[in-house]
Each structure stands twice: as C-alpha cells, then as structure tokens.
Amino acid sequence: GVILTGSHVIDGAKDIDVTTYNGKVYKASVLAIMGKNKDLALLKITPKQHLKTIPFGNSELVKVGQKVLAIGNPFGFTGTLTSGIVSRIDYTKGRIQTDAAINPGCSGGPLLNSKGEVIGISQSIYNPDKNISNIGIGLAIPINEAKKFIQSANLSSNLK
C-alpha cells in the first residue's frame, strides 16, 4: 500500500510506523518526498491483505462554504473526525483554509468533502500566539497538488 502524508510528519524519523484504521501497525519506507514548501510524502507499506482506499476528489471544485471533514490523531486521540467548512481558498500559497479542527497530530491526514473524497492533506494551523491550540484556522494542501506530486514520482498507476 502507498500512503500519502505530509513530509513534516516524517521529517527526521529513522523508523516510520503507519497505523491503519483497524489498529494494525506496519513499518514504512519512503518512496518520495516533496520538500517543506509543498510538504508531501509518499510512504510504502506491505500489508498481507488489500487495504481500503479513500478516493481522490478534485480540489479545483472546492468552494468557500462547502462542508468538509478532517481525520487525524490530535494529541494521540486516534481516528478523530472533525467537521467544518472551507473558509477560504488561498490561490497564491496553494492552501485550503478550513475551520474543521486541525490540531497537532492531524497534519498529514485527509480533508474530505461530503462525498468522502480527499480534497486536501491537512498541513498546519495558523496561530499567531504560537501555542498549539486550534483557533479555527486550519490549512490543507489541495489534493490536485498531491496528484501532480504522485505523477512526478511516477507512481500514479499504483494509486487510486
């Protein structure tokens, strides 16, 4: 299985473990990294059985006000699902802004539309006070940027 996540999530790690939705833990290897500016990474795990996948959406169709869901592991609370809306689309920096709670431990996880399609990869929160609490400004990398990354890594035939 190939896992898409944020490169800062694995930055500096000697060993990388991926835990799936059912609690199984797999050793992962890095297939490709797209630097800190884009903050994307592809990991490879070797499960004994087929993994469920989440379909990619089209981030060009994302609209301000649309409902979104973020999945992550904030502060170690595994499998957390939060909801919100798209607050803004920053075309200059290439980010989707949302008020869905994205806290430490959520980055690298999917931002989903109401159809359950991945429209972004949760990246960070904006917090001018420099504490680690979410103030309602979460940022995600649009999935179309990730699709370009996957194509450039010549792995698109292995992914859905």
Task: Spell out what each predicted region is.
Residues 56-63, 76, 80, 106, ...:
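Soluble non-cytosolic domains of exported or imported proteins
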Residues 28-31, 86, 111:
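Conserved hydrophobic positions within beta-strands
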Residues 13, 51, 118-160:
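C-terminal cap/linker of serine protease catalytic domains
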